[in-house]
Amino acid sequence: MLEKLIERVLFATRWLLAPLCIAMSLVLVVLGYVFMKELWHMLSHLNTISETDLVLSALGLVDLLFMAGLVLMVLLASYESFVSKLDKVDASEITWLKHTDFNALKLKVSLSIVAISAIFLLKRYMSLEDVLSSIPKDTPLSHNPIFWQVVIHLVFVCSALLAAVTNNIAFSQNKAH
């Protein structure tokens, strides 16, 4: 009797994630607002914007879109996996979610982080002259911010590769059984 009560209480705690999922949907609203603000800024300066600034603005919008997609993916998968099935939604609308297990979600998140990091580095590359001109010539490599941004990006890439290899090994072992 006590065991069943404890199990029911523990299982019911999954609903504590529901408010967090709702709060994450507010993050989407904020990202949408920032996206529209950046788009408006870009469009309102269309006649005077340089090609470099246009590319940087476009990369910023792509970055925000990736981030919004990442938030949505984690939000829906978390709700579906831990809180409740999304059975009120047309199943054809979320077919990807039905085939997304925790390992696949980790891989998608890792790849999204790599893409976001790559876009950030590309934006830095577009303004490389400004960044390098602000660094004294005798500065050691370890004090160069671009060096560390590339190192962090490579860590993200290696993490995503390791996650993919681990997922592939685990999937092939499960398939063999």
UniProtKB/Swiss-Prot annotation:
Protein's cellular compartments: Cell membrane
Pfam families per UniProt: UPF0114
InterPro entries membership: UPF0114, UPF0114_bac
Major localisation: membrane
Ranges annotated as spanning the membrane: 15-35, 54-74, 145-165
Keywords, alphabetical: Cell membrane, Membrane, Transmembrane, Transmembrane helix
GO CC, any one term: plasma membrane
Membrane topology of the entry: Multi-pass membrane protein
Family statement drawn from the similarity comment of this UniProt entry: Belongs to the UPF0114 family.
Full protein name: UPF0114 protein HP_0189
Native species: Helicobacter pylori (strain ATCC 700392 / 26695) (Campylobacter pylori)
